[in-house]
Swiss-Prot record:
Belongs to the nucleobase:cation symporter-2 (NCS2) (TC 2.A.40) family. This is Nucleobase-ascorbate transporter 5. It is found in: Membrane. The chain crosses the membrane at residues 35-55, 71-91, 93-113, 133-153, 159-179, 181-201, 219-239, 285-305, 367-387, 390-410, 418-438, 460-479. Keywords: Membrane, Transmembrane, Transmembrane helix, Transport. Its main location: membrane. It comes from Arabidopsis thaliana (Mouse-ear cress).
Length: 528
């Protein structure tokens, strides 16, 4: 198409199946020194969730700093294993597989169940609760393993279009807004400078100092965390938080001596380290529903990762394969006793966008750091002592990038269609509104809107409707596949024709380049 004449109508930006301006795509690794630093950066980012979840749950379970340190080490170790499995045998996307907030409500429900009230020793109570979550996770893992490896989830993904994927991927990022600025505000004198410095280094400095363009853009996390961590250290050293409330000290202080002293120098986590798993049918069903919610959210996260890795849309068979290996990740989490299930790390997906480096090798190196620092507990505990508002400042940028990745899929859709506008607007609105009702009800009354005598049934209903990505994605998927589907023009409005070539593995040569299994395994496990 020729360029418009001067004064003519401007041309729209052409849709791009692969995101341009990515420095290193999924198959092109950066030089080793740079790759190692980038891998360490991914490790720093995933530490946030790894530390925050045990820090919130372990004291309520009855555990001490020793148990908290061991649980953090276990989650780190398992995350490293699962990330390697996903990048080598799963989708092969540069996706970090870490602890997921989706499983937290079910873990809390297990913790509050009356069957542990008779345990007097707090540490023994902690171990019993962990063993109960182990049993639930082991059973729940079968859902994703069966749906993924049998190809059943592939049949669901085939009906996905850019229109229905946009709310799903968008809410995977934007739906985590509660972990962003509210976390920054827990210690505003640390969190807000962290956010401002991160934006200055990553967005403005590359344009001001041309020679260091790539350095500032790619290593903004390391620079900003180091600067603000040092600033927080001097505030702590100067006595700024002496005499303040416990919550403020926990959020602001850098001298978490309890965690560092409690961590062993060298410790290798092992399966069933807390004891034999405890199985309960109700808890297993509740955890299975959380697993299904994580499956839907991870499908959106895989699409976001593929976008920022400058890869094409993953074929349904590849996403299904990744879901199967994510089921294996939940199984490993259950065997090792992490107390929480696994899914795709949304914050690390956002880091791909910030650095413009979607290399698979970088994420595999980060998995090596996870395993290394999980074994050397003291060193890992030092990095785990980074104040949470600094991590929340990173989340503000990373979750925004993932949400924007979802909105970018709308370039394939007809935004002048009222059908498109209805599905897009209605699904995003309900994706925010319904979980808001469920979460508000839980915060005010202490239990969800569905409150029967069966705790497991309550969790099976309350957990999915508390997930913004799950609600918004399901509403968009349902409307998009049922509303005037037989109309021929609707297919183009949905953007389906842009993804047709990626719906089977052999249709596009780029698919095999990005997603083929290593060691010629496609010969024995062919994708369709």
């Amino acid at each position: 198409m020729s360029a418009p004449k001067s004064g003519g109508d401007p041309l729209p930006h052409p849709p791009k199946e692969q995101l341009p301006d990515i420095s290193y795509c999924i198959t092109s690794p950066p030089p080793w020194p740079e790759a190692v630093l980038l891998g360490f950066q991914h490790y720093l980012v995933m530490l946030g969730t790894t530390v925050l979840i045990p820090s919130a749950l372990v004291p309520q379970m009855g555990g001490r700093n020793e148990e908290k340190a061991k649980l953090i080490q276990t989650i780190l170790f398992v995350a490293g294993l699962n990330t390697l499995l996903q990048t080598v045998f799963g989708t092969r996307l540069p996706a970090v597989i870490g602890a997921s907030y989706t499983f937290v409500p079910v873990t809390i429900s297990i913790m509050l169940s009356g069957r542990f009230n008779d345990v007097a020793d707090p540490v023994e109570r902690f171990k019993r609760i962990i063993r109960a979550t182990q049993g639930a996770l082991i059973v729940a893992s079968t859902l994703q393993i069966i749906l993924g490896f049998s190809g059943l989830w592939r049949n669901v993904v085939r009906f996905l279009s850019p229109l229905s994927a946009a709310p799903l991927v968008g809410l995977v990022g934007y739906g985590l807004y509660e972990l962003g600025f509210p976390g920054v505000a827990k210690c505003i004198e640390i969190g807000l400078p962290g956010l401002i410095i991160l934006i200055l280094i990553s967005q403005y400095m590359p344009h001001v100092i041309k020679g260091g363009k790539h350095v500032f853009a790619r290593f903004a996390v390391i620079f900003s965390v180091a600067i603000v961590w040092l600033y927080a250290f001097f505030l702590t050293l100067g006595g700024a938080y002496n005499g303040v409330g416990t919550d403020t000290q926990r959020s602001c202080r850098t001298d978490r001596a309890g965690l560092i002293s409690a961590a062993p120098w060298i410790r290798v986590p092992w399966p069933f380290q807390w004891g034999a798993p405890l199985f309960d049918a109700g808890e297993a069903f509740a955890m299975m529903m959380a697993s299904f919610v994580a499956l839907v959210e991870s499908t959106g996260a895989f699409i976001a990762v593929s976008r920022y890795a400058s890869a094409t849309m993953p074929p349904p068979s590849v996403i299904s394969r990744g879901v199967g290996w994510q089921g294996v990740a939940i199984l490993i989490s259950g065997l090792f006793g992490t107390g929480i299930g696994s899914s795709v790390s949304v914050e690390n997906a956002g880091l791909l966008a910030l650095t413009k480096i979607g290399s698979r090798r970088v994420v595999q190196i980060s998995a090596g750091f996870m395993i290394f620092f999980s074994i050397l507990g003291k060193f890992g505990a030092v990095f785990a002592s980074i104040p949470s508002p600094i991590i929340a400042a990173l989340y503000c940028l990373f979750f925004a990038y993932v949400g924007a990745g979802g909105l970018s899929l709308l370039q394939f859709c007809n935004l002048n269609s009222f059908r498109t506008l209805f599905i897009l607007g209605f699904s995003i609105f309900l994706g925010l509104s319904i979980p808001q009702y469920f979460n508000e009800h839980t915060a005010i009354k202490g239990y969800g809107p569905v409150h029967t005598g069966a705790r497991w049934f309550n969790d099976m209903v309350n957990v999915p409707f508390s997930s913004k990505a799950f609600v918004g994605g399901c509403v968009a998927y349902l409307l998009d596949t049922t509303l005037h589907k037989k109309d021929g023009s609707i297919r183009k409005d949905r953007g389906k024709h842009w993804w047709d070539r990626f719906w089977t593995f052999k249709n596009d040569p780029r698919t095999e380049e990005f997603y083929a299994l290593p060691f010629n395994l496609n010969k024995y496990f062919p994708s369709v």
